[in-house]
Amino acid sequence: MIQPQTLLNVADNSGARELMCIRIIGASNRRYAHIGDVIVAVIKEAVPNMPLARSEVVRAVIVRTCKELKRDNGMIIRYDDNAAVVIDQEGNPKGTRVFGAIARELRQLNFTKIVSLAPEVL
């Protein structure tokens, strides 16, 4: 469960290393975001000499959360960290690689480009 002020790792090579959630896209009074939700975040830590710099406001899609994800078949998936992938306005990733495992639910949410770049889909 991601809420405003939550720090997230970045799971791509866009140049950002750490994000802080500042808003959840969707309903105006949503409190938490889960896997597949789009958030507005600020870059707290970035790699030098890359297109994305510190204190930039970006959109990101959440790909991993520490909170369990319950599937319809009874399976429960939990990750070790909270992570997101930086995206543009059309929903395409800004980086060219995605690191770590990605949940299968992103495919149903039309983030197929992120799923195709991921090394492992759970």
Swiss-Prot record:
<dbReference type="Pfam" id="PF00238">
    <property type="entry name" value="Ribosomal_L14"/>
</dbReference>
<dbReference type="GO" id="GO:0009507">
    <property type="term" value="C:chloroplast"/>
</dbReference>
<comment type="function">
    <text>Binds to 23S rRNA.</text>
</comment>
<keyword id="KW-0689">Ribosomal protein</keyword>
<dbReference type="GO" id="GO:0006412">
    <property type="term" value="P:translation"/>
</dbReference>
<dbReference type="InterPro" id="IPR005745">
    <property type="entry name" value="Ribosomal_uL14_bac-type"/>
</dbReference>
<keyword id="KW-0150">Chloroplast</keyword>
<protein>
    <recommendedName>
        <fullName>Large ribosomal subunit protein uL14c</fullName>
    </recommendedName>
</protein>
<dbReference type="GO" id="GO:0022625">
    <property type="term" value="C:cytosolic large ribosomal subunit"/>
</dbReference>
<dbReference type="GO" id="GO:0003735">
    <property type="term" value="F:structural constituent of ribosome"/>
</dbReference>
<dbReference type="InterPro" id="IPR019972">
    <property type="entry name" value="Ribosomal_uL14_CS"/>
</dbReference>
<dbReference type="GO" id="GO:0070180">
    <property type="term" value="F:large ribosomal subunit rRNA binding"/>
</dbReference>
<keyword id="KW-0687">Ribonucleoprotein</keyword>
<keyword id="KW-0934">Plastid</keyword>
<comment type="subunit">
    <text>Part of the 50S ribosomal subunit.</text>
</comment>
<dbReference type="InterPro" id="IPR036853">
    <property type="entry name" value="Ribosomal_uL14_sf"/>
</dbReference>
<dbReference type="InterPro" id="IPR000218">
    <property type="entry name" value="Ribosomal_uL14"/>
</dbReference>
<comment type="similarity">
    <text>Belongs to the universal ribosomal protein uL14 family.</text>
</comment>
<keyword id="KW-0699">rRNA-binding</keyword>
<keyword id="KW-0694">RNA-binding</keyword>
